[in-house]
């Protein structure tokens, strides 16, 4: 019974990690409100989870802010590229879907744009963790994240399905 009240026991360590994850989620959420900073916030989230939560080092606020500032420029560039791709493909998908609803045969090409958006999302799954983990040029980050996504296609598909399930759960609740 004396070990139960010890702050270093497994229960309190686990509780501390849960609180850290909640705080990190709040940091990430508030820094994603201005859409431009979402890439840097996501990179900082991955960096902090890896360094503080997994490896039990340092403090979450300090590490999150350090990673946010350090990776801000590169993450923002990658995020804006990704947003531009999503905007173009989303617009094309919407227009072609409207053509398909109107009975135009070429409108069925919206499926191609939807699949391209799916691949862009699977690529994005690896972009920000890659930036958080490695220092590289932006062009190499984009290339290597794509190679990782394609090289681990089944795991990437599983991550994509989990991401869709999480998005659906947030939408429902």
Per-segment meaning from a language model:
Residues 116:
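Conserved, surface-exposed functional patches that form binding/active-site neighborhoods
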Residues 1-113, 121-173:
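Helix-coil boundary and N-terminal low-complexity module in membrane systems
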């Amino acid at each position: 019974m004396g070990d139960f009240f010890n702050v270093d026991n497994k229960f309190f360590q686990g509780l501390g990690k849960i609180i850290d994850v909640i705080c990190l989620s709040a940091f990430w959420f508030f820094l994603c409100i201005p859409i431009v900073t979402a890439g840097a916030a996501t990179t900082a989230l991955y960096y902090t989870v890896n360094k503080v939560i997994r490896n039990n080092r340092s403090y979450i606020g300090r590490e999150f802010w350090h990673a946010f500032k350090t990776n801000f420029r590169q993450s923002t560039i990658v995020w804006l590229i990704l947003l531009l791709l999503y905007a173009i493909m989303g617009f094309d998908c919407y227009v072609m879907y409207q053509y398909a609803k109107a009975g135009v045969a070429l409108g069925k090409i919206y499926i191609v744009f939807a699949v391209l958006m799916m691949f862009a999302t699977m690529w994005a799954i690896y972009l920000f963790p890659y930036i958080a983990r490695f220092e590289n040029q932006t062009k190499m980050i984009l290339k290597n994240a794509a190679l990782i996504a394609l090289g681990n296609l089944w795991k990437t598909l599983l991550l994509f399905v989990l991401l869709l399930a999480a998005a659906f759960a947030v939408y429902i609740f």
